[in-house]
From Swiss-Prot:
Coiled coil: none annotated. Part of the 50S ribosomal subunit. Keywords: Ribonucleoprotein, Ribosomal protein. Belongs to the bacterial ribosomal protein bL31 family. Type B subfamily. One of its GO terms (molecular function) is structural constituent of ribosome. This is Large ribosomal subunit protein bL31B. Disulfide bonds: none annotated.
Length: 91
């Protein structure tokens, strides 16, 4: 590997925005927010990255369904593209 071309890979705490559960792992992501985490070497401070979905809240892993705002997505599509009719003109 060439030195100096790879991003810094360091410990980071990810927090699920829905459940509040936190996971300590390694990542290239960083954040200005920090959190204290108890380790075998004492309490350490790590960057905190808040994410929308983790395995703690994803329906595939929890076995529960989550209501998705499909109606809002449909309205956004209709506003953007309107109700376009077939392109054939009757001349």
């Amino acid at each position: 590997m060439k030195p100096g071309i790879h991003p810094d890979y360091h410990p980071v705490v990810f927090q699920d925005a829905n459940t509040g559960k936190q996971f300590l792992t390694r990542s290239t992501l960083t954040s200005a927010r920090t959190v204290e985490w108890e380790t075998s070497e004492g309490v350490r401070e790590y960057p905190l990255v808040v994410v929308e979905v983790t395995s703690d809240s994803h329906p595939f892993w929890t076995g529960s369904r989550r209501i998705v705002d499909a109606a809002g997505q449909v309205e956004k599509f209709r506003r953007r593209y309107g109700s376009r009719k077939s392109g054939a003109s009757s001349d």
